[in-house]
Amino acid sequence: MMESGEALLKKLDGRLSGLRGRLTPDTGMDKITWFRAGGPAQVLFQPSDEEDLSAFLKAVPEEIPLLVVGIGSNLLVRDGGVPGFVVRLSAKGFGEVEQVCDTQLRAGAAAPDKRVAAAALEAGLAGFHFYHGIPGGIGGALRMNAGANGVETRERVVEVRALDRKGEVHVLSNADMGYAYRHSSASPDLIFTSVLFEGVPGERDDIRRAMDEVQHHRETVQPVREKTGGSTFKNPEGTSAWKEIDKAGCRGLRVGGAQMSEMHCNFMINTGNATGHDLETLGETVRARVFENSGIRLHWEIKRLGLFREGEQLEEFLGKII
């Protein structure tokens, strides 16, 4: 069982006294994630700005676990909670989007994807319309090479600013990010703080039309008004995850309060009282049934964090294909 957040802060007494951000022990992650499920963060830290984050990283011993989350759209938190520190970048210090020249935007890692799309529209820059349909933040988009409608984040990135676990600044080029489908090979220890994007000059009416099409498509085929984390699984090569899920008979499948959406069966939803364990068990059950039906191994697109609650674990037959 995880010790209390107060106990962790007491161990670090004095080390964190100069921070300007907010330290909150034993914070329910269900208040942060879009699934509205899961256990607590031992300590949640919300830095004021990059300088404050750097000071925090320099003060916290590297043996203490540390995880970074964005706006919580693609996170599944287990019910036993997340040990150590969870760092959440706030919109106040990391959420700005500004035009820096005719074709470039700089965005903080906590900026919602939609805000970047809106800023690009205002600047008359094409190539960012796909962000209008992604329910997430830029930090997560950089980490997973988020994309939609045939466009990916890597197509717009010039360079990414990040801090390492020692609080030192790094600037990564597009090549340094090592992008592939829904993946970046950049060190998982790096915390992205901002990005420089490159767009293409375009007509605002055309950009707005593309954004409207993205929004219409999303509202038509995705359960946007449900408690969901977005696409659950990555698309396998040569097919779509939802098609394989549907063929395996998993559309509408339920475990406890968790359900594969009837509207789009690659979306898991919390119907009201789902636990993190319900959601993960449902996802693993779907993976097992798809593998049994077609031999295809689905890979999670949603990031799973934390510890199982005492006495809980995934069913043995499911663990064989994790």
From Swiss-Prot:
| Catalytic residue positions | 182, 231 (proton donor), 301
Catalytic activity, as annotated: UDP-N-acetyl-alpha-D-muramate + NADP(+) = UDP-N-acetyl-3-O-(1-carboxyvinyl)-alpha-D-glucosamine + NADPH + H(+)
Pfam families (UniProt xref): FAD_binding_4 (PF01565), MurB_C (PF02873)
Q: What is its EC number?
A: 1.3.1.98
GO terms (BP aspect)? cell division; cell wall organization; peptidoglycan biosynthetic process; regulation of cell shape
The family database entries (InterPro entries) matched by this protein are listed as: FAD-bd_PCMH, FAD-bd_PCMH-like_sf, FAD-bd_PCMH_sub1, FAD-bd_PCMH_sub2, MurB, MurB_C, MurB_C_sf, Oxid_FAD_bind_N
Predominant cellular place of this UniProt entry's protein: cytoplasm
- To which pathway does this protein belong? Cell wall biogenesis; peptidoglycan biosynthesis
GO molecular function annotation: FAD binding; UDP-N-acetylmuramate dehydrogenase activity
Q: Enumerate the cofactors the protein uses.
A: FAD
Q: Name one GO cellular component term.
A: cytosol
Q: Which UniProt keywords apply?
A: Cell cycle, Cell division, Cell shape, Cell wall biogenesis/degradation, Cytoplasm, FAD, Flavoprotein, NADP, Oxidoreductase, Peptidoglycan synthesis
State if Transcription is listed as a keyword: no
Q: Where is the FAD-binding PCMH-type domain?
A: 36-202
Q: Kindly give the PROSITE patterns that the UniProt entry links to this protein.
A: FAD_PCMH
- Kindly list the places in or outside the cell where this protein is found, as annotated in its UniProt entry: Cytoplasm
What's the domain of life for this entry?
A: Bacteria
* Family note: Belongs to the MurB family.
List, alphabetically, the PANTHER family matched.
UDP-N-ACETYLENOLPYRUVOYLGLUCOSAMINE REDUCTASE
Q: What does this protein do?
A: Cell wall formation.
Protein name in UniProt: UDP-N-acetylenolpyruvoylglucosamine reductase
Q: Which organism is it from?
A: Brucella suis (strain ATCC 23445 / NCTC 10510)
